[in-house]
Amino acid sequence: MTATKKIGILFGKERSFPMAFIEAINRRNLPGITAEPVRIDKVIQGEPSGYDVIIDRISQDVPFYRAYLKNAALRGTAVINNPFWWSADEKFFNNCLATRIGVPVPKTVILPSHDLPPDTSDQSFINLTYPLDWDTIFHYVGFPAYMKPFAGGGWKNVYKLHNAEEFYQRHGETGQLVMLLQEEIVFTEYYRCYCIGGKYVRIMSYEPRNPHHLRYEA
């Protein structure tokens, strides 16, 4: 008898996609395959997770889950997205990489956090010039511009800025977040690309102004 292969999905506040994904898998009645929300009651080093595949929708916000997923991957679970890429998967690095391989991206600069990070003082930043060269930064990016965290997603802490005065006001509200200032691109078409295993690619139309469940045209 073939052992059942379990697909788990790890998620947070969202409900529409995770539950629809689980229902779509189970509705197919594929022999030996079942899908469910990931259940975690303990995480012991080197022990398997009990899942053959885990779809990750939340570990970018929860360090505990990132550690859990890395342990699961080491024990043979296929984790989507790759948990070992998390440290490199931030917007500024991705933009820098794109510039090196010839992919057009919006003009972007990274900004130090407005407030000092924990356990630091002014003496921690003797290599950083204050004030920054704001004139050059604003001339390079232009206005309108968007300011957003350099890592993470979910459209959190994103600001549209029309001038330097708005920038200074909003930047003062961002606390210890490291932010990007990015050129506005007024798009006529918007696409997202999903790649699995560095091999399978799906390009999909995407409308970010729609409700979440109506954004993709797959």
Q: Over which residues does each language-model region extend?
A:
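Short, solvent-exposed loop/turn segments at secondary-structure junctions
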Residues: 14-16, 60-61, 86, 151-153, ...
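Alpha-helical structural motif
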Residues: 17, 130-133, 196-199
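A generic membrane alpha-helix/interface feature
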Residues: 24, 68, 94, 120, ...
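Phosphate-binding core of ATP-grasp and ATP-grasp-like enzymes
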Residues: 175-178, 184-218
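Short glycine-/acidic-enriched loop or helix-start segments at secondary-structure transitions
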Residues: 19-20, 65-67, 91, 156-158, ...
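Conserved N-proximal alpha/beta basic substrate-recognition cap immediately N-terminal to
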Residues: 12-124
